[in-house]
Amino acid sequence: MGSGSSRSSRTLRRRRSPESLPAGPGAAALEGGTRRRVPVAAAEVPGAAAEEAPGRDPSPVAPPDGRDETLRLLDELLAESAAWGPPEPAPRRPARLRPTAVAGSAVCAEQSTEGHPGSGNVSEAPGSGRKKPERPAAISYDHSEEGLMASIEREYCR
């Protein structure tokens, strides 16, 4: 099955307004960065009548898939975008602190720290070594359940 690119490019050419015609032998050059162009008369474009008539092949002057027009438009856009300047950086949010033990984790905490010599004991006292976040988290974390999670890890990681 074909891609339909020749049909879609013909449809796009029919829908174009006179201002969007490519600069060619009968079109005026861009003046002072404006996009006004003088429309090309139909007699000056050899492939215009051939494209409109069904069953006829377009002239070899017009590309069958519109690649030249696409490349020209992309080059024009690239030239315009160079004048825009760098984009403004997005504001950054402070990182949230996450709890050390996550319920439902597939890997046992003891197994994940076996190969690390200075890792110490996995089940520390709640809140030890952690800084309080500057603002309250959207989801509150219940520190009283940490002992329960540690006992479950010990039982299932034997």
Swiss-Prot record:
Which tissues is this chain's protein expressed in? Expressed at high levels in the kidney and pancreas. Moderate expression seen in the skeletal muscle, liver and heart. A weak expression seen in the brain, lung, uterus, prostate, testis, small intestine and colon.
For this entry, the protein name equals: Cystin-1
Would you tell me the Gene Ontology cellular component terms?
A: ciliary membrane; cilium; cytoskeleton; cytosol
Primary location group = membrane
Question: What kind of membrane protein is this, topologically?
Answer: Lipid-anchor
Residue stretches of biased makeup (Low complexity): 19-32, 39-52
Cellular location of this protein?
Cell projection, Cilium membrane; Cytoplasm, Cytoskeleton, Cilium axoneme
Chain positions covered by the region annotation Disordered: 1-146
Record note on quaternary structure: Interacts (when myristoylated) with UNC119 and UNC119B; interaction is required for localization to cilium.
Q: Where is the composition biased (Basic and acidic residues)?
A: 65-75
UniProtKB keywords = Cell membrane, Cell projection, Cilium, Cytoplasm, Cytoskeleton, Lipoprotein, Membrane, Myristate
Q: Residues bearing covalent lipid (N-myristoyl glycine)?
A: 2
In chain numbering, motif Ciliary targeting motif lies across 29-33
What broad taxonomic lineage does this protein's source fall under? Eukaryota, Metazoa, Chordata, Craniata, Vertebrata
- Highest taxon in the source lineage: Eukaryota
